[in-house]
Amino acid sequence: PRSKYFAWDNFRRFQQSWGMANGMEREDFQELMNTHKEAHAIHYKRDFSPEQMRELALNYKQAVESRGFGIPEDPWEQLIGAVDMVFDSWHTPKAEEYRRLMGVSDDWGTAVIVQAMVFGNLGLQSGSGVLFTAHPYRKVRRVALWGDYAIGDQGEDIVSGLVTSHPISVEQAEIDGRDENKSLERRFPNTYQRLLSISRELVYDKEWNPQEIEFTFEGAEAEQLYILQTRDMITIKKKEH
């Protein structure tokens, strides 16, 4: 049953991503989600049955098609369409304003990376998160993992603030007054230790600046962790050379 839920959840997410890339608003889909939760007396979407998730996914599909943005059946057409959307994003008002403020040429264009996807929404032993390798409140030189993660969700859910998230470390939970038993360090110790090891390697061994790391894990074992992106923390003053 969980695999059916997973399949329909991904179908739902695909419909929403495609629709939003074509100009639909997140609220268009959130309204459908809220209505569906209310109809089935559900608080968290992970509590939908596979059939209920199927119904919601098809509602998303209908909403996208009603706006003229239906997804083509041919996977190759889907891929080419997705690539074209990324290219077109270079010309959005937000992107143009950013380039103007940052002094970036309009002639550069953008690249498109096509890669395999990993799934934080596989089940209750999977999840996604964002962490910082430096303490946000105290000036300490050691690596200290700080951030948020969610179980059974994708990274976009966390970044958008759509789901209830939990602290990364026990130290963070104690300082923030949150439940340390829900921290990644307590619930998924193998994942936490692997992230700590990677963070120390980047900061101590490679001498990178403090990092902001996005990650997904498809299971509770260390080898099921995937680093999606890492970049310099913008809240930390970079080292002077």
Regions found by a protein language model. Give the residues of each.
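Nucleotide/phosphate-binding sheet-loop regions of phosphoryl- and nucleotidyl-transfer enzymes
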Residues: 1-241
